[in-house]
């Protein structure tokens, strides 16, 4: 195995996980903050807001998991070797 390809794969795997978690992390923080603000304004809508929040958090977390899958593919099933 070429050491340059191995090193590039490890760096790319780290970047895949790191960059794939930045956007969802910011989005989840913003969504949670807005949900808390919405519940503070309308406590009677807490159940509906919480359900929508949990669904949207799951979709955001899926993006991070996709980055993890790409990183694992680069580390263990490297298509460049």
Curated annotation (Swiss-Prot):
One GO BP: proton motive force-driven ATP synthesis
GO molecular function terms attached to this record: lipid binding; proton-transporting ATP synthase activity, rotational mechanism
Bilayer topology: Multi-pass membrane protein
Keywords, in A-Z order: ATP synthesis, CF(0), Chloroplast, Hydrogen ion transport, Ion transport, Lipid-binding, Membrane, Plastid, Thylakoid, Transmembrane, Transmembrane helix, Transport
Alphabetized PROSITE patterns for the sequence: ATPASE_C
Domain of life: Eukaryota
Miscellaneous: In plastids the F-type ATPase is also known as CF(1)CF(0).
Known partners and oligomeric status: F-type ATPases have 2 components, F(1) - the catalytic core - and F(0) - the membrane proton channel. F(1) has five subunits: alpha(3), beta(3), gamma(1), delta(1), epsilon(1). F(0) has four main subunits: a(1), b(1), b'(1) and c(10-14). The alpha and beta chains form an alternating ring which encloses part of the gamma chain. F(1) is attached to F(0) by a central stalk formed by the gamma and epsilon chains, while a peripheral stalk is formed by the delta, b and b' chains.
Protein name per the record: ATP synthase subunit c, chloroplastic
Species of the source: Glycine max
């Amino acid at each position: 195995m070429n050491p340059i390809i191995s090193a590039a794969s490890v760096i790319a795997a780290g970047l895949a996980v790191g960059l794939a978690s930045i956007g969802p992390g910011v989005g989840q923080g913003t969504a949670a903050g807005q949900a808390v603000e919405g519940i503070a304004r309308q406590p009677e809508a807490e159940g509906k807001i919480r359900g929508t929040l949990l669904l949207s958090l799951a979709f955001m977390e899926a993006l991070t998991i996709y980055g993890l899958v790409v990183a694992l593919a680069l580390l263990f099933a490297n298509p460049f070797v």
